[in-house]
Regions:
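Single conserved hydrophobic/aromatic residue that forms the stacking wall/gate
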Residues: 1-8, 12
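Short beta-strand immediately N-terminal to the catalytic nucleophile in serine-hydrolase-like folds
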Residues: 74-77, 100-102, 125
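Gly/Ala-rich beta-loop-alpha elbow adjacent to hydrolase catalytic centers
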Residues: 76-81, 85
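Short beta-strand/loop motif that positions the catalytic acidic residue
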Residues: 123-126, 130
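C-terminal catalytic histidine-bearing segment of alpha/beta-hydrolase fold enzymes
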Residues: 139-172
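A conserved short beta-strand
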Residues: 94-106
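Conserved alpha/beta-hydrolase
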Residues: 13-29
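Gly/Ser-rich "nucleophile elbow"/oxyanion-hole loop immediately N-terminal to the catalytic nucleophile
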Residues: 34-74
Length: 172
C-alpha cells in the first residue's frame, strides 16, 4: 500500500511524482535516490539499479491501487530523478505512457543500450545555464535516443539554471 506521504505526492491520478527516498546529502531541502558524491561510474550504476527496483515497485503499487495499465502512467523526475526515470522507464516490460525529465542525464549509455525493452514517449527539458547537470547531458541523451530509434522531444530553457521553470511545469 502507498503511505499517506506517497498519496500526497501523487500529482494527479495517472502521474507519479514521488520524492526520492533519502534526504539529499548536498542539499538539505532536496531528496536523492542515492548519494552521487565521490562515487565511481560503476558504483553509481550499481546504486541506480537499486533505485530502479524501488521505482518499479512504486509504479506497480500505483497500478494495482488505482487499477491502471502501464500505458496510463507518466513518470518523471528532476535531476537524479530524471536519471532514474529514464533508466527505469525504458527497461520496463510493460511500457509506461511517457517519461518527463528535467535537468538529468543518462547514467550509463552502455548499460541502457543493452537493456532497452520498451519505447515510451520521452520529453526532456533542461536549462541552458545549468551548472549542476550541464546542458550537454540533454544533447547526449537526445543523440542516444535518436540512435536507438526513439522519438524524443526536447526543450531548452533560456537563462535557466538547475531548476524547473514555470514553463517546464506546464509542458510536463
Amino acid at each position: 500500500h502507498l503511505s499517506d506521504r506517497r498519496q500526497r505526492q501523487m500529482c494527479i491520478r495517472d502521474r507519479i511524482c514521488p520524492d526520492a527516498p533519502e534526504k539529499c546529502a548536498a542539499s538539505p531541502t532536496g531528496f536523492q535516490w542515492f548519494d552521487l558524491m565521490d562515487q565511481s561510474p560503476e558504483q553509481i550504476l550499481s546504486k541506480s539499479l537499486v533505485a530502479e527496483n524501488k521505482l518499479n515497485k512504486l509504479i506497480d503499487e500505483v497500478k494495482e491501487k488505482y487499477d491502471l495499465k502501464a500505458n496510463d502512467i507518466i513518470i518523471g523526475g528532476f535531476s537524479q530523478g530524471c536519471m532514474i526515470t529514464l533508466q527505469t522507464g525504458i527497461k520496463r516490460k510493460d511500457t509506461v505512457n511517457s517519461i518527463v525529465g528535467y535537468s538529468g542525464r543518462i547514467i550509463s549509455t552502455e548499460h541502457l543500450s543493452k537493456n532497452i525493452v520498451s519505447r515510451p514517449n520521452i520529453i526532456l527539458m533542461h536549462g541552458d545555464l545549468d551548472q549542476v547537470v550541464p546542458i550537454e547531458s540533454l544533447l547526449e541523451a537526445k543523440e542516444f535516443f535518436g540512435k536507438n530509434n526513439y522519438e524524443i522531444e526536447t526543450k531548452i530553457f533560456k537563462h535557466c539554471e538547475h531548476r524547473i521553470p514555470t514553463e517546464g511545469s506546464s509542458l510536463g
